[in-house]
Regions:
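Basic nucleic-acid-binding interfaces
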Residues: 1-19, 31-61
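Minor-groove-contacting beta-hairpin "wing" of winged helix-turn-helix DNA-binding domains
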Residues: 24-28
């Protein structure tokens, strides 16, 4: 799964981009606590990293 795919899923679930520095982008949700950091741009994220990001966002893969 690429970082673009993860970002599309996050945006569809209501997460919005709040900060980017270097190769990492942070997203925040208006109703959920915390921030999610996505390494971007990256063609293929390791499977464990992709699952952890989706789990933290409350999205089922």
């Amino acid at each position: 799964m690429s970082s673009d795919d993860i970002i599309k899923l996050l945006k569809a679930a209501g997460w919005r981009k709040v900060h980017q520095k270097g190769s990492h982008t942070q997203f925040k949700h208006s109703a959920k606590p915390g921030k999610i950091t996505v390494p971007h741009p990256k063609k293929d994220l390791p499977l464990g990293t992709a699952r952890a990001i989706l789990k933290q966002a409350g999205i089922q893969p």
